[in-house]
């Protein structure tokens, strides 16, 4: 099958509609949304988005809540580090 798009990639389906800057923004979101992520439980590159905020691993069948378009958000990273720091303070 021939390659259809060179620059536009996944947003080629929108054609010339909606403007270039909006298509670039949507392209970033759709690439992160459709890509596979590393599973925290089994370590394989098998975590895929099932629905908005629901991510499932194809390998170990774990289902976790995450971001709408990205598996791990910046807010989740901040909360995780704060919880880890509080846990370490409590133990010591």
From Swiss-Prot:
It comes from Cryptochiton stelleri. One of its GO terms (cellular component) is ribonucleoprotein complex. Belongs to the eukaryotic ribosomal protein eL43 family. The keyword Aminoacyl-tRNA synthetase does not apply. A zinc finger (C4-type) spans 39-60. GO terms for biological process: translation. This is Large ribosomal subunit protein eL43. The gene is RPL37A. Pfam families: Ribosomal_L37ae. HAMAP family: Ribosomal_eL43.
